């Protein structure tokens, strides 16, 4: 009996002495990496589509809690940026989602603007708002400033309720000498002032995501997006930096305090929310909106929520993401719930991360969804026939 006990104890001691590796050899569980691991790391990036194993709560939001004004769309626009949807079907879709109004930003001017007004604005009162734009083909005309003021007046008389400026200002529009037109170019001053006189807002897209100004390489967090759209890259000496562009923009904001500006895409730099907050503090004539920046904001939910809570009177709901119902429902989930680690709505892929819900309180939701936009458009002083 004493001999058997000794054998058992000796066996146990040997097992413990051998450590986890020794026991693993018997069970098939390993504690050392495979010697051929490096040779297996050859999966193509496009084929790497991991499915999260996280078991997180899911709260689907099929319909917004409060009526919504989407201030950033291009649906049935004059430029051809947005989705083409039959207006009657679009209204039915909006009703299902609790969307009160959508703003079509790229309406151009003249006959093209009139077509949108005749086909969408007039037949469906209150459901569609359309903006006008600059005609850059006239930039070299010595009377450019006066021509744009007259064009804005004509557009407003037709029914336009704002001016939209695409990112081409500062990045693409050039004069006859090849020189880029700066955002704070003095030739634009009369147009900004005219918008203030009429009480219509200027929605301006300045720069683009910060990653678009970085090299397209393995360190760029939006590599896949830029490979798909290399024309979205603004890296190189032929382009001004993001910092230079927002500096031009800020000089323009300061020069025209009586004009209301909306700094699209959450103030032009959502990767830097301290900068966005400084913009709002510095310029009382500036508002922001959420268009196409759910991904950027959703990955930094605590700081983003602070901005929403502190500046709840200055933020509007915008998408800039087509007209799909699932897209809208994803935005609603992001704003209304506290769900964790779920996909953002935008396509193409912006970056390999997930987002987190903000869980905004009702009073803030109402302002963001419709209250702030209603207050902005209520500043209209007349000048149109509609």
Language-model region placement:
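Bacterial N-terminal signal peptides
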Residues: 7-19
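Active-site gating/metal-coordination segments in enzymes
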Residues: 33-50, 113-232
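Mature N-terminal segment immediately following signal peptide/propeptide cleavage
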Residues: 54-88, 92, 370
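Acidic (Asp/Glu)-rich catalytic clusters
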Residues: 58-63, 90-96, 115-128, 150-160, ...
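Hydrophobic faces of well-ordered beta-strands that scaffold small-molecule active sites
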Residues: 68-73, 101-104, 129-133, 163-165, ...
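Divalent metal-dependent hydrolysis catalytic cores, especially in the metallo-beta-lactamase
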Residues: 73-74, 83, 89-111, 128-135, ...
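Acidic-and-aromatic substrate-binding clefts and catalytic sites of carbohydrate-active enzymes
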Residues: 76-85, 105-114, 137-146, 173, ...
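H/E-rich (His + Asp/Glu) clusters that bind or coordinate divalent metals
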Residues: 237-386
């Amino acid at each position: 009996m004493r001999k058997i006990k000794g054998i058992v104890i000796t066996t146990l001691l040997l097992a413990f002495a051998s450590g986890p590796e020794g026991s693993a050899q018997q069970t098939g569980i390993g504690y050392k990496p495979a010697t051929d691991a490096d040779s297996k790391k050859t999966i193509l990036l496009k084929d790497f589509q991991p499915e999260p194993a996280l078991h997180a709560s899911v709260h689907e939001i099929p319909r917004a809690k409060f009526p919504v004004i989407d201030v950033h769309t291009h649906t049935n626009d004059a430029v051809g940026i947005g989705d083409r949807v039959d207006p009657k079907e679009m209204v039915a879709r909006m009703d299902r989602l609790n969307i009160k109004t959508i703003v079509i930003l790229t309406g151009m001017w003249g006959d093209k603007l009139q077509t949108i007004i005749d086909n969408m604005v007039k037949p469906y009162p209150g459901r569609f708002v359309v903006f006008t734009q600059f005609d850059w083909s006239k930039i070299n005309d010595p009377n450019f400033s006066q021509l744009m003021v007259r064009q804005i007046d004509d557009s407003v008389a037709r029914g336009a309720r704002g001016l939209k400026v695409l990112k081409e200002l500062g990045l693409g529009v050039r004069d006859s000498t090849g020189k880029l037109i700066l955002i704070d170019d003095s030739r634009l001053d009369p147009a900004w002032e005219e918008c203030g006189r009429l009480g219509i807002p200027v929605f301006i897209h300045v720069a683009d995501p910060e990653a678009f100004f970085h090299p397209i390489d393995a360190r760029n967090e939006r590599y896949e997006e830029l490979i798909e759209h290399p024309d979205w890259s603004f890296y190189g000496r032929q382009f001004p930096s993001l910092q230079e562009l927002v500096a031009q923009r800020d000089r323009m904001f300061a020069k025209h305090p009586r004009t209301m500006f909306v700094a699209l895409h959450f103030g032009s730099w959502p990767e830097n929310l301290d900068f966005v907050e400084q913009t709002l503090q510095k310029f009382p004539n500036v508002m922001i909106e959420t268009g196409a920046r759910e991904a950027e904001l959703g990955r930094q939910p605590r700081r983003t929520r602070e901005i929403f809570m502190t500046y709840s009177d200055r933020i509007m709901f915008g998408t800039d993401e087509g007209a799909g119902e699932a897209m809208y429902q994803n935005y609603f989930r992001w704003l209304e719930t506290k769900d964790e680690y779920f996909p953002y709505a935008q396509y193409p892929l912006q970056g390999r991360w997930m987002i987190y819900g903000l869980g905004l309180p009702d009073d803030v939701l109402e302002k963001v969804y419709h209250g702030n936009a209603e207050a902005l458009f209520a500043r209209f002083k007349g000048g149109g026939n509609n």
